[in-house]
């Protein structure tokens, strides 16, 4: 394998994981903070808020997992080799 392609694949994998984690990380922090705030204002709605929060956190986390899958493909099943 060309060393330039190998180095570019490693850098691209690092960027894929890093950039894929920034957005969902900020979103999860914001969503969790707002959920805690909502539960503090309306304790009787805790069940609905928590259910919605967990579902939305799962969707946000899937974006990070997609970035990880792309990084693993670039590292181990390199399509550019």
UniProtKB/Swiss-Prot annotation:
It comes from Microcystis aeruginosa (strain NIES-843 / IAM M-2473). It is a multi-pass membrane protein. Its main location: membrane. This is ATP synthase subunit c. The lineage of its organism: Bacteria, Bacillati, Cyanobacteriota, Cyanophyceae, Oscillatoriophycideae. It holds the Pfam family ATP-synt_C. The gene is atpE. One of its GO terms (molecular function) is lipid binding. InterPro entries: ATP_synth_csu_bac/chlpt (IPR005953), ATP_synth_F0_csu (IPR000454), ATP_synth_F0_csu_DDCD_BS (IPR020537), ATP_synth_F0_csu_sf (IPR038662), ATPase_proteolipid_c-like_dom (IPR002379), F/V-ATP_Csub_sf (IPR035921). Belongs to the ATPase C chain family. F(1)F(0) ATP synthase produces ATP from ADP in the presence of a proton or sodium gradient. F-type ATPases consist of two structural domains, F(1) containing the extramembraneous catalytic core and F(0) containing the membrane proton channel, linked together by a central stalk and a peripheral stalk. During catalysis, ATP synthesis in the catalytic domain of F(1) is coupled via a rotary mechanism of the central stalk subunits to proton translocation. F-type ATPases have 2 components, F(1) - the catalytic core - and F(0) - the membrane proton channel. F(1) has five subunits: alpha(3), beta(3), gamma(1), delta(1), epsilon(1). F(0) has four main subunits: a(1), b(1), b'(1) and c(10-14). The alpha and beta chains form an alternating ring which encloses part of the gamma chain. F(1) is attached to F(0) by a central stalk formed by the gamma and epsilon chains, while a peripheral stalk is formed by the delta, b and b' chains. GO terms for cellular component: plasma membrane-derived thylakoid membrane; proton-transporting ATP synthase complex; proton-transporting two-sector ATPase complex, proton-transporting domain. Keywords: ATP synthesis, CF(0), Hydrogen ion transport, Ion transport, Lipid-binding, Membrane, Thylakoid, Transmembrane, Transmembrane helix, Transport. The chain crosses the membrane at residues 5-25, 57-77. It is found in: Cellular thylakoid membrane. The keyword Lyase does not apply. The record marks 61 as: Reversibly protonated during proton transport. HAMAP family: ATP_synth_c_bact (MF_01396).
């Amino acid at each position: 394998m060309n060393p330039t392609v190998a180095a570019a694949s490693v850098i691209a994998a690092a960027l894929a994981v890093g950039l894929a984690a920034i957005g969902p990380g900020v979103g999860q922090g914001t969503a969790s903070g707002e959920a805690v705030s909502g539960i503090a204002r309306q304790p009787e709605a805790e069940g609905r808020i928590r259910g919605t929060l967990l579902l939305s956190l799962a969707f946000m986390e899937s974006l990070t997992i997609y970035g990880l899958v792309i990084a693993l493909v670039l590292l181990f099943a390199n399509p550019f080799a």
